[in-house]
Every structure is written in structure tokens, then in C-alpha cells.
Amino acid sequence: IWGDDMPVTTENVEAGFTVDSYDNADFRPFLVPYLVSDQSQAKGTLIVLSGGGNTTRSNPNEAYRVAPAFLDLGYNCFVLQRRVEPYNNEDIVMDLQRSVRYIKYHAPEWGIDLENTLLGATGFSGGAGNLCTLMEKFYGDITPDQFDTDYVCDEIDAVNSDLDIAIPIY
């Protein structure tokens, strides 16, 4: 979702990666799509964030069960594989912010009609906390370069990062 440049506000993040880290230092956030086959029938689009308390991603028990269920109900879903520890909360939430913008930016090429359907996000536990932080600190036109001054914004960062609906769960 980030391309060649990714904002990082975590101090000395490379030193935080150990043998016990959930991801390796080369991890890059990405989205796993679950798209309605006939977009004219799609009821909306939902970003799904698993829990894991910012140290792991509980995808098998949460995101990978929820996304297919929403797809069966007629909703496009994207499971966000966001950064986790040793990255700080700002970096993790910027991944969510970027995913909102990324989906809005690419919606036309995927046939997703965001003019007539809603874009929302749901999160479990740590993912719910990330979602609440997005709504509190990373909404609208706030861009990553306001947190990481070395980051250079691109055309995707010019897209508004507001959601139509947010569903934080436990």
C-alpha cells in the first residue's frame, strides 16, 4: 500500500526486531481483497483489522473469518496486514489511514462504486483501538508527513481518509 516510501516515526525501529518479532524487518503492509464478483450488487466496502494488541495479528480467528462472512452478505472486504511491534501506534495507524486512501484511490479500477455505497472499517481489540485512533488523530486531510517529516506525500495521500462508518469491536 505504501510503494517505495513508507513513513516511520518509531525511534531506532531496526533495533527493535529480534528473533521473537512477529514480522521481519522487511515486512511491508498490504491488503488482502475479498471482492463481490458483480460490483453492481455490492452493498459497501469494509476494511477488516484483526486484534493482536499491536504485537501480532490475530487473522485466523478474526479477520479471515469475518471477511468471507461479509463477502457472503454482499460486501467487499479488505483485510489489512498492518505493521505491529516494534512499530509504534502512530506507524500502525498510518497503515490504516493509507489503506482507506488506497481503496478510495483505486476503487474505480476495481469497479467499486464509493459514490453510492459506504466505505467502513471494523476492528477487533487492538485493531479496534487503531480504528479509534484513526478517527481521533488521522482523519480527513491529515497526512503522514505531519508525523514523519522525511516522508514525501504522493497522489494517494491527497485523498481524504475519512470513513463513512466505523465499527470497533471489543
Task: Identify the role of each PLM range.
Residues 58-65, 80-114:
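Catalytic nucleophile-loop/oxyanion-hole region of alpha/beta-hydrolase
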Residues 6-7, 52-55, 84-87, 125-129:
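Solvent-exposed loop/turn segments at secondary-structure junctions
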Residues 25, 39-41, 71-72, 113-115, ...:
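Extracellular/periplasmic catalytic domains that process cell-envelope and extracellular macromolecules
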Residues 1-41, 89-90:
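N-terminal cap/lid segment of alpha/beta-hydrolase-fold proteins
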Residues 98-170:
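Primarily recognizes the serine-hydrolase "nucleophile elbow" in alpha/beta-hydrolase
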Residues 45, 71-81, 165:
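A fold-wide structural signal in alpha/beta-hydrolase
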Residues 42-51:
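Short beta-strand element of the alpha/beta-hydrolase
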Residues 43-44, 57-60, 90, 132-135, ...:
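Short, solvent-exposed loop/turn and secondary-structure capping segments
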